[in-house]
Amino acid sequence: MKKMLALLSAVLMTGAFLIPSAHAQDIRARMKQRIPQIAELKKSGVIGEDSKGYLAFVNGKGNPQADAVVKTENADRKTVYAYIAKKENVSVDVVASQRAAKLAQIAKSGEYIQKNGKWVRK
């Protein structure tokens, strides 16, 4: 489990994607490009990190642009989680929940995180 968490952190925190092919570079570039948009949406309280390792709207839905950011980020996260799960021979849910714990830990003060199914500001 510690090995998997270390691998997950390396993949997502440093951007050192281990997914073979140019597809990995595409994912990395897309995720990097979305960082400012995600940061702004978090800062404004529109989205937060849910307890399953994905972005979610705190109060329903956002505007079409925010919806697109969340949808594409979550799709890319799922791809990364699936690769790690396959490599580590665990479920995607295990990888995602480990990442959720890390994201909650590193969330900035004032950002929303999901705890026990409820949104709370860190």
Model features per residue range: what roles?
Residues 18-24:
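Sec/Tat signal peptide C-region and signal peptidase I cleavage site
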Residues 10-11, 22:
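Cleavable N-terminal signal peptides
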Residues 81-82:
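Contiguous, amphipathic alpha-helical segments that mediate oligomerization or scaffolding
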